[in-house]
Amino acid sequence: MARSIKKGPFCDAHLLKKVEAAAASRDKKPIKTWSRRSTILPDFIGLTIAVHNGRQHVPVYVTENMVGHKLGEFALTRTFKGHAADKKAKK
């Protein structure tokens, strides 16, 4: 179920402070965050945000198409190594 429009998008306050500071200083260094639940706002466009995936911080460069999505959507948490090969098919 989607979030109510009257509530507006959710974004952690500490992340907003970091984004505002980076925008004011024109800093291109990635902003490190653990907040996968935060919605990407138009203020984030052009910034690189390092989103934690449970093991490391994955750099995510924010573009216009990402606005409205969550940060966690762009930092995958699972690594798929492939299914076991079928031994009968190899013969």
Curated annotation (Swiss-Prot):
Keywords: Ribonucleoprotein, Ribosomal protein, RNA-binding, rRNA-binding. GO terms for molecular function: rRNA binding; structural constituent of ribosome. GO terms for cellular component: cytoplasm; small ribosomal subunit. It holds the Pfam family Ribosomal_S19. One of its GO terms (biological process) is ribosomal small subunit assembly. InterPro entries: Ribosomal_uS19, Ribosomal_uS19_bac-type, Ribosomal_uS19_CS, Ribosomal_uS19_SF. The keyword Lyase does not apply. HAMAP family: Ribosomal_uS19. Protein S19 forms a complex with S13 that binds strongly to the 16S ribosomal RNA. Belongs to the universal ribosomal protein uS19 family. This is Small ribosomal subunit protein uS19. It comes from Paraburkholderia phymatum (strain DSM 17167 / CIP 108236 / LMG 21445 / STM815).
